[in-house]
UniProtKB/Swiss-Prot annotation:
Keywords: Secreted. It is found in: Secreted. GO terms for cellular component: extracellular region. This is Unknown protein 3.
Length: 12
């Protein structure tokens, strides 16, 4: 995962 992917996963 990239930093952007982690941010989106946490928001989901």
């Amino acid at each position: 995962f990239t930093a952007a992917a982690e941010a989106e996963a946490a928001a989901a």
